[in-house]
């Protein structure tokens, strides 16, 4: 379990990148949901935390590949492989990421 930041410090519609062995991006959607995925686009090495968030979709800033934050699945080309998703919890106002195992997509 990795502490990220206080919930109040991550506004809706924003994201934050955390440095782990493989960087992780945490997103706070306009609907108030929290999602975490590997931060690197599976098409090319672009940071998804720098992409455009719309609903539960994140668009890669490099070639406009799009991923569903809930599943990690790509929703359009050029990406063909999913990004790994991670479980997110909030404890005492602090966002935590529970890293998924190397195999599979969800923690």
Language model features with spans:
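N-terminal pre-ligand scaffold of iron-sulfur
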Residues: 1-55, 68-69, 82-107
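Short cysteine clusters
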Residues: 41, 60-63
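Short cysteine/histidine-rich metal-coordination sites, predominantly Zn2+-binding motifs
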Residues: 55-61, 74-83
């Amino acid at each position: 379990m990795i502490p990220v930041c206080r919930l109040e410090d991550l506004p809706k519609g924003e994201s934050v990148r955390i440095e782990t062995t493989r960087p992780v991006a945490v997103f706070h959607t306009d609907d108030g949901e929290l999602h975490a995925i590997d931060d690197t686009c599976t098409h090319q090495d672009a940071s998804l935390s720098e992409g455009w968030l719309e609903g539960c979709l994140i668009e890669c800033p490099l070639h406009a590949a799009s991923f569903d934050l809930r599943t990690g699945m790509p929703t359009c080309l050029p990406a063909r492989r999913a990004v790994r998703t991670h479980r997110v919890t909030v404890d005492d106002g602090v966002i935590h990421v529970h890293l998924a195992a190397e195999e599979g997509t969800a923690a």
